[in-house]
Amino acid sequence: MLLTLTAVARAQDAATGAVAGRVTDASGAAVAGVKVKATRTATGAVRETTTDADGTHVLTSLVPGEYRIEFEAAGFNPRALDHGLVQVGARLTVDAVLDVQGRAETIEVSEPGVSVPTGNGLVGGVVGAGVVENLPLNGRNFLELAFLLPGNAPAPNFDPTKTNVVAISSAGQLGRGGNITIDGQDNNDDVVGGPLANLPQDAVQEFQMATNRFSAEQGRSAASAVNVVTRSGGDTLAGSLSVFVRDDALQGLPATFDRTQEAPPFSRQQYSATLGGPIARGRAWWFAAAEYRNQDSVVQTGTRDVAARTIRQSLAAAPLNDFLGMARIDVRATDQDTLGFRYLVQDEDDVAASTLDRSIGSATQRQSSDNRHQQGLATWTRVLGTTSVNTLRASYSNFRNVIDPVAPGRQLTFPSIQDGASFRVPQGTTQTRWQFSDSLSWVKGAHSLRVGAEYSHTYGRFDLGVFREGRVELVQDFAQFDLNRDGRVDDDDLLFAVTLRSGKPDQNLLLDDCSSSYISGFVQDDWRVTPQLTLNVGLRYELDSDVKNISGYADTNPIVQAFYQGDRGRDLDNFGPRLGFAWTNRRGMLQLHGGFGLYYDRVTLEIISLERGLDGRALPIEVRAGNVFFLDPGTGSVPPFAPTFADPFTGFILPGAGASGINIIDNSLENPTVQQYNLGARYRLPGDAVLQLDLVHNRGTHFIIGRTVGEVFNPVVGGPDRVVNLESSVGTRYDALLTSLEKRFGRGQQLRVSYSLARARNYANDDQIPFSSGPIDPNDLEREYGPTPNEQRHRLVLSGSFLLPLELRLSGIWTIASAVPMDILMPDASHRVPTLSRNVGAREFENAAELNAYLTSLNAKGGIDGVPLPLVREDARFSDSFDSLDLRLSRRFALTSSLSLEAIVECFNVFNVTNVLGVSKTNYSGFANVLARDSSDPADAGFLRSSSFGRALTTAGGVFGSGGPRAFQLGLRAQF
């Protein structure tokens, strides 16, 4: 007997897998009518089918897990395979060769290796429960598993609600997009983008990441699709209890921290528990998991040392409490019907840094967040016959976020640091979603077909206290002159250009019912043309009902009606064809694959909030002149009636000067679209390791940017106001070689190597919401084309788990990446140097000498608007590479036949490499990127010198995160 095992990602339900293959006799002839039975080991649930005339068998919509697969046919020996592993979003191919009747035979597969797949050319991978359990994930967040696979990296922070969230940047996109599902349920933030809820790490059964070219069954993403399946109970009562601890005695400090300051204490404790078992053996099962994290952490901040005229790196307290819970019940109601019910809850509060417009913020720029999330899911799977299965899902989710400043006050935006309280808070958002989906899969001859549809309605609500306390735009980090003639030079002598404050400072901006419905349908056919060649053909349609604010269009400001062109309607032509091929040689050693797909990204409801909120009426911004306008160049002083640093909002109004303007949604705005192409190969190496290489080319169109298109007189502000058009007029490009090597051994041992060689380009440091910045020249958007802020040309990740002598297990993750680029900003940090493209640091300029040569040439031509720019230090840096090795050493002790205790020691960043990196989209490099002058006096030599530029400000991961200073963590896990 011969059984060939293969695992392959293909067109499967987002929460299930499949078993398929071909049965032949000893001569190679197909055997029809073979009864194929798959029995799930944990529960005894059975699915059956028979082979067709070609000997082909397919069982779809299987719950991921371990199965016994049996073959029975008249005149042949019965055969069976034990421990066949069905993975999420993947097909386990079992090809069997039957011989004439004799003794029965069972093939024991304790842990299948990785084989060359057949049937699909998807770019991605699956991370199983054993990997999730053994690898040292620094934050114990399931989304960190995405970084083990090529083409994925952390994304910059893009919104105050996401300061403690793992956001994934896939295939060059920046984190707002992507599609994350848990058990097939949408887990995405439709309000601002990015992921929504976390779940206990020990509740994850499997994690699948489709980085590129996924099937028509999955959509609403122009980047990647993440499918997570939670664990379920079995016929045996089983559970675990874990604790992980670390504190400042086991933890280093960031290299940028000023050691002359006292470091606040910090610690973290994480507790996790699981328990599951039968309600009625063979019929119903339950499972529950809970995790609690109590963290007294710190965040990296800056402190203005006025006496020393420098900005010192410091730390500020950032406590966090996070409870995660999950419970599910699975019922085998009949032999054909399976019901599933799952509930998730997250209750989290934290203090963290707010979203920054500068490279670093002060301690007062922290914010206090309160997040509540819950979701429920019901699933009904019905086996309609030996070749067809239908799955119906209904779900509800609710998310509420409230953010307040740690202390009220105005925002002080210095060129090099953001001080005071963030102007973005207080704020709160609410999202409620109802979702319904149905999918039908059936096998007809050589065709494996799936067809389905989805409907969801998302209600969004914004409660925004933005600009209530105001914002002061300063032009220098420290005062240079005694402006007020009081005999000393201090902060009362600081120069500031403008102030911005809400014209209604006593009330929040409330935007209710920012809602939209989503409708989609798909058909997918995986056609096995020959035993070696499969064609993947699919078509998906998607529609968002109201992301263009159709329901609020009649209420837009009449003074901007002339700027709307044409009629506003829904984007109705979002058809996404998918076409691919996969060819495998007869020996099953080599697969060639490739294809094309058209993918549409979601448009977040924040777009609606911009048109409704920044309409020139709902949130009027008073822009007033700063004391710069009152400066007497002859005396170097300001008159007594000028606005002061202590009382800055007394200047005369400058209508339209620096405010966000009136935002309008272009009537032709469309969903961002990406054309994805790939061509690749998989090859089985000696020792059953599999090497995969994919050439990927993605071209994005219709991405959103805000462009100033004119001015109108706004009676609310008493003068002209600029009009900003939110339009689908820019694109993206991503070209990459994605490589992976995977090998599985017995007893949970495995090795994975992932490498990405990539180039990512776009037109903005935020690829959806152009709120805080716009193009240098609104009539020449090509000047905005440049690297994404988190582009890493090279990224290598090695992960694995191995058994050592003395029954020790060593597991690790080693991440090495090249430097990200850096924007180079003007001395007042208002925008980048206008003669430069975006993010040219560490790209066009490799070192300070090259930048200084450019600046010298620019100054010789008159500088910017006749003012020369300062040169930087010879040792100034733009960016830093990344290198972090995380290890776990553990040993399991068997206390009884069913109870074990595992002792765990983890070390993160073993070699204590300093990895300078930022968090904000404004400056992700972590180095000071403002050409801040040493002196604001044109007669002083410091006017043409910027000593602070290129200085390291923040390190990757802060204190606790990945790539941060070396840290040890101790753990203990009991299992039964």
Annotate each language-model stretch with its function.
Residues 2-128, 186, 200-202:
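Periplasm-facing N-terminal accessory domains of Gram-negative outer-membrane beta-barrel systems
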Residues 96, 148-151, 187, 201-244, ...:
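A beta-strand signature from Gram-negative outer-membrane beta-barrel systems
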Residues 133-189, 221-231:
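Extracytoplasmic beta-strand/coil segments of soluble accessory domains associated
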Residues 142, 155, 549-576, 580-725, ...:
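Solvent-exposed loop/turn elements at secondary-structure boundaries
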Residues 238, 264-349, 368-396, 577:
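Transmembrane beta-barrel wall of Gram-negative outer-membrane proteins
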Residues 639, 643-652, 660, 807-898, ...:
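Extracytoplasmic gating/loop element in the C-terminal half of outer-membrane beta-barrel translocons
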Residues 692-823:
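Gram-negative outer-membrane beta-barrel transporters
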